UniProtKB/Swiss-Prot annotation:
Alphabetic keyword roster: Repeat, Riboflavin biosynthesis, Transferase
GO cellular component, one term: cytosol
Reaction(s) catalysed (UniProt annotation): 2 6,7-dimethyl-8-(1-D-ribityl)lumazine + H(+) = 5-amino-6-(D-ribitylamino)uracil + riboflavin
Binding, 2,4-dihydroxypteridine 2: 48-50, 62-67, 101-103, 137
Sites where the protein binds 2,4-dihydroxypteridine 1: 4-6, 146-148, 160-165
Native organism: Buchnera aphidicola subsp. Baizongia pistaciae (strain Bp)
Alphabetized NCBIfam families for the sequence: PRK09289.1 (NF006767), PRK13020.1 (NF009566), ribE (TIGR00187)
EC number: 2.5.1.9
Gene for this chain: ribE
Protein name as it appears in the record: Riboflavin synthase
Length: 212
């Protein structure tokens, strides 16, 4: 589990593509790799990946074909920076919201506005089906960053980026057309899906509950 608070950036220094797997080498800070162990989970642009090897400030991860197909990691090239977060430990502060690192869909940056030192970023979902899980002031995780939904229109939503987020993550450098990873709030998904199932199976009982 993660919190959506990016702890540092990593530079992809090597990508080795094989038949059904891609091996990455990511260089980051001493602080971020301190006490990092083999087999540990690490969030790379919001994707939960497993550390396969560590050499000084470089760690290695394997990315399977399904992850490459269903996330924006297939757009990353050598030299590009990604958002990193170590897995949370019990007792630590949860500054964002709980996220699993399991990407539900991707989105495309459809509009970007500079607001003094802030930014307004609009993202269109690649699969409009998932827009039902988006609510005003709800949580969303974009490329591993915990953000608050500012507005929703059709199959798109907007987030407002403060200077700290722009400075410490890659999202401030996004341009129109860039693909980003999206993880919806787990609890919102459970609530929406549960209500939908109840309406489908017992619509009259649900309506009676509302009347009461």
């Amino acid at each position: 589990m993660f919190t959506g608070i990016v702890r540092g950036l990593g530079k992809v220094v090597k990508i080795l593509k094989e038949k059904k797997i891609s091996q990455w080498e990511v260089e980051t800070s001493n602080e971020l790799v301190k006490n990092l162990m083999l087999g540990a989970s690490i969030s790379c642009n919001g994707c939960c990946l497993t550390v396969r090897n560590i050499f000084r400030t470089i760690f290695c991860v394997d990315i399977v074909e399904e992850t490459l197909r269903s996330t924006s990691l297939n757009t990353i090239i050598v030299g590009q920076y990604i958002n990193l977060e170590r897995s949370i430990k019990f007792g630590e502060e949860v500054g964002g919201h709980l996220v699993s690192g399991h990407i539900i869909t991707t989105g495309v940056v459809s509009d970007k506005k500079e607001l003094f030192s802030n930014q307004e970023l609009w993202i269109s979902l690649s699969a409009s089906f998932f827009i039902k899980y988006f609510f005003y002031k709800g949580f969303v995780c974009v490329d591993g960053i915990s953000l608050t939904i500012g507005s929703i229109k059709n199959n798109a939503f907007c987030v407002f980026l403060i200077p700290e987020t722009i400075l410490r993550t890659t999202i401030g450098q996004k341009i129109i057309g860039d693909v980003v990873n999206i993880e919806i709030d787990f609890y919102t998904q459970i609530t929406v899906d549960s209500v939908e199932r109840l309406l489908k199976v017992h619509p009259s009982k649900f309506i009676n509950c509302i009347d009461i």
